[in-house]
């Protein structure tokens, strides 16, 4: 009898460890919704911790959308654009409906966005739509842009110029492969 009770306890413990609780993912996501924009987007406890999590891999797109919705009155248009872009990237990388990812990529556009950002977006959309010539044209135009002296990194450091050229080069190198593969298919520095 003791042996049976012990076996039941061990099995129950193993079953609890086998799959993370949906509630724990929801609790993490709910806690993120109260973070500042900077902490939510770039911090170690923000949405990226869900995207890279083996426990909660499907939670990132939903929490990005919910954060945008809850904070829409306080967020600037560029910040809304950035969160929309990240949701599109996560959905594309997860292999979700590609039309949804492309729609979100297009929604990320805003009046007055920097040319480098627009070209990166256009090149990414061209990749998603299987249009290599549009991807190449966006890449070449991005490569020819003059440096933006106002663009700085998070800590005020210089930013690699032009931003995301390596990403478009990777999309070209791995054209036809899934976004999740092509996004990290970048030339060695």
Residue spans for each PLM region:
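Positively charged n-region of N-terminal signal peptides that target proteins for export
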Residues: 1-4
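C-terminal motif of bacterial Sec signal peptides marking the signal peptidase cleavage site
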Residues: 15-16
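N-terminal alpha-helical interaction modules that lie
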Residues: 20-87, 141-189
């Amino acid at each position: 009898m003791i042996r049976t009770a012990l076996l039941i306890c061990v099995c129950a413990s193993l079953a609890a460890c086998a799959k993370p609780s949906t509630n724990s993912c929801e609790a993490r996501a709910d806690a993120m919704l109260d973070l500042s924009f900077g902490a939510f987007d770039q911090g170690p406890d923000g949405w990226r911790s869900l995207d890279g999590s083996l426990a909660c891999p499907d939670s990132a797109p939903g929490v990005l959308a919910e954060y945008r919705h809850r904070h829409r009155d306080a967020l600037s248009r560029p910040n809304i654009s950035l969160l929309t872009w990240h949701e599109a990237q996560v959905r594309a990388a997860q292999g979700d409906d590609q039309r949804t990812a492309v729609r979100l990529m297009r929604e990320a556009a805003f009046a007055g966005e920097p040319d480098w950002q627009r070209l990166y977006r256009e090149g990414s959309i061209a990749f998603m739509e299987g249009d290599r010539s549009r991807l190449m044209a966006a890449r070449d135009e991005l490569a020819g842009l003059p440096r933006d002296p106002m663009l700085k990194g998070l800590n005020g450091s210089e930013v690699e110029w032009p931003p995301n050229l390596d990403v478009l080069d990777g999309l070209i190198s791995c054209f036809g492969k899934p976004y999740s593969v092509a996004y990290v298919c970048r030339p060695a520095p």
